A protein has these predicted regions:
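C-terminal catalytic or substrate-handling cores of phosphate/nucleotide-
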Residues: 6-163
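C-terminal accessory/interaction regions of large nucleic acid-associated machines
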Residues: 149-221
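Active-site beta-strand/loop microenvironment that shapes enzyme catalytic pockets
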Residues: 1
Length: 221
């Protein structure tokens, strides 16, 4: 006999999923999506025009545009880059950011500054959309290697700080984001990237993250 459950709400469904997953072999990253903070982020972003995809292809299958969709992994990568200053880790191990308990708690273990998550995601999406158009000479692999460095640098330029808190991210003025800022940061990051060999290995190294942060400090007033 098979018992079919028809949950009456998203919250009920999430509780059922969590209870079921705890009894089966499910990746920790999949379980993260049912954490209350991610449900709150999804609702908050939806009210502000972004769609936080806790379940793979959920909004894609509803016909939402790619530039409107924010995946859980992408938000984690943006926060890792902007909040923790580790674009190297965002590039090197995107799939494990959510399974690392220490890193996860640093990013999502707070009470939850929903506006900060929204602004980090919005900044990340805008940079990823404009960056390839501004730097048309770059190859796809180069864009993938340095985009989170550019996101980190742009956030620093907008805040005039080389180290950001949740409060700083919440107060980022995205109206000040310009092609000029993106190009300035991208040119600087690309110079560092090429000086270190211009490879994926370089982009995944702490040496590059450290050097880029040093260069960002020189760009700030």
């Amino acid at each position: 006999m098979v018992k079919i459950l028809v949950p009456g709400s998203d919250e009920t469904r999430n509780r059922v999923i969590l209870a079921t997953n705890n009894q089966t072999q499910v990746k920790k990253t999949s379980l993260r999506a049912t954490d209350q903070i991610h449900i709150q982020i999804e609702l908050y972003m939806k009210r502000n025009g972004l769609y936080y995809e806790r379940r793979k292809n959920y909004y894609k299958n509803q016909g939402r545009k790619r530039e409107e969709i924010v995946t859980l992994s992408f938000l984690a990568q943006c926060m890792m880059s902007i909040l923790l200053g580790r674009p190297d880790q965002a590039r090197a191990r995107p799939s494990t950011l959510l399974s690392d308990e220490v890193q996860y708690k640093k990013i999502f273990g707070q009470d939850g500054n929903l506006e900060a998550y929204y602004r980090a995601a919005s900044l990340g999406k805008q940079v990823c959309l404009k960056f390839p158009q501004i730097k048309r000479d770059l190859e796809g692999s180069q864009i993938s290697d340095i985009r989170f460095y550019v996101i980190m640098g742009v956030a620093s330029m907008l805040s005039n700080k080389d180290s950001l808190t949740f409060g700083d991210i919440e107060n980022l003025d995205l109206d000040k984001l310009s092609d000029e800022i993106i190009q300035t940061v991208a040119d600087m990051v690309m110079d560092v990237y090429l000086a270190l060999g211009g490879t994926s290995k370089a982009a995944k190294s702490y040496a590059m993250a450290s050097k880029v942060k040093e260069k960002i400090s020189l760009l700030l007033p």
